[in-house]
Each structure stands twice: as C-alpha cells, then as structure tokens.
C-alpha cells in the first residue's frame, strides 16, 4: 500500500498545475487530498459540476466536505451544466455515460483552457476498468489523467488510504448520478430526476442513507444497504415509504427490494 501511495504522489509531483474533477465521493476526495499534498494548494483547483443529476443531499455533503477539508488555499469552481439540453444524453441509450462524460469534461477543460500547463484529473480507480463504464472512453479521448488508476489503487485501497488520511467519507457508499436510476431506453426527464431525488432524500432522512430508488419500465426497484435491510423489513418505514411514493404517483411492490 505504501508503494502505491508513493507512486501516486510521485506521478502528481511531475505535474505543474492540476484541476481535480471533484464529486464529493471518496475517490475524488482522496485524489484531491493527494494532489494538495504533492503540489501544494496554490497549484490545485477543484472543479465541481452542478446540475439536475446531483441529488440535493449529495450536493450539500460534497460542498460541506470540501469546506471542512480544504478551508484555505484550494479554489473550488462550481460549474453549472444542463444535461437535459443534451439530446444524445436524454435519449438514455447504453452510451449515456459516454455522452455525459464527454460533454462535462470538455466543459471542465474549457474552464482553464488558457492555462495550458494545467491537467484535468479524474478519480477512476483500478476496479472501475473491470466493469462496463462507457465514460472511460470519453476520458481516454479527452486525455484526462487518471492517477489513482495509474497507481493501481483499487476501491478497497482508496478507502483504506482515505481512512488513514482522516477523510470522513472513507466509508461513504458509492453514489452515481440520478440518471443511473432510470432504466435504459426511457428518456431522462426533469420530473423523473426530481422524484428519484425526493424518494432517496426521504429514505436518507428516515435513517437509510445510500439507498437507491430505481425506475425500471413502470416498476420501482429499491436498493437498501445490506446492513440496513433487516431493519427496513421490520420497521413501519415501509408503510411510510409506500405512502410517500404513492403521493408521487408510483405504486410499489416490496418484492422489488434488494440489497446493494
């Protein structure tokens, strides 16, 4: 592990200035922390996308975490984008993530286009390349650097290093954008994203953070963290949740609850 961390720092020290794509997840947080350690805060900026794809709780947590960990010196640029204006994204094919990542990282790069020495960094890790991730193609095409992947860091490695560094989100469940909750082929609409965000926020407030509310065709598929499943099965939260999503216009079958 020490060798991988040393390799990460060594690769970062070769760069003059960097911009880290920061989401608030453990991968991008560790990468940003390592970049600040290797280069100093004045040579690092964080770029954070603000859009309808970020849940309200996720957005608040990301900004609060940044303010706690990097109170001085590191600039945070919040970049507003409108994915619902990207027709190739809204169509929601199996290449949705490719189109989104390509648009988003182009926009990030445009933010510092005059600073030719500044490189954009992404928090992809070694486990990500073992999965189907269309966004990886966009990362390669745009020549975005992936220092965690290059250092051979797995998700488990990253969580351990984040814990050792005192990063409070080291055990935070992985959280993708709200569009991933909509079944492939169904158009991405603002109304759907709002309902997903509202349902997941309800579960979070009820003591089930990290739950996912998926819309597959006309059915709801709910994912609850493994350690919380037993409690979810026996508490009155089920009835409260059923009432809540009914008010949003959805029926719900508790046979469609799985662990994540």
Feature-to-residue mapping (PLM):
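Conserved beta-strand segments that form the floor/walls of ligand-binding pockets within enzyme
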Residues: 21, 177, 223
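Short proline/glycine- and acidic-rich turn/helix-capping motifs at secondary-structure junctions
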Residues: 253-260
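Mid-to-C-terminal catalytic subdomains of enzymes
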Residues: 149-203, 207-213
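A short interface-forming secondary-structure element
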Residues: 217, 221-234
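Generic alpha-helical secondary structure
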Residues: 105, 189-196, 234-238
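ATP-dependent adenylation/nucleotidyltransferase module used to activate substrates
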Residues: 1-164, 205, 220, 236-251
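A short, flexible beta-alpha/helix-coil linker loop
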Residues: 84, 183-184, 227-229
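Active-site beta-loop-alpha junctions enriched in small/polar residues
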Residues: 125, 216-218, 258
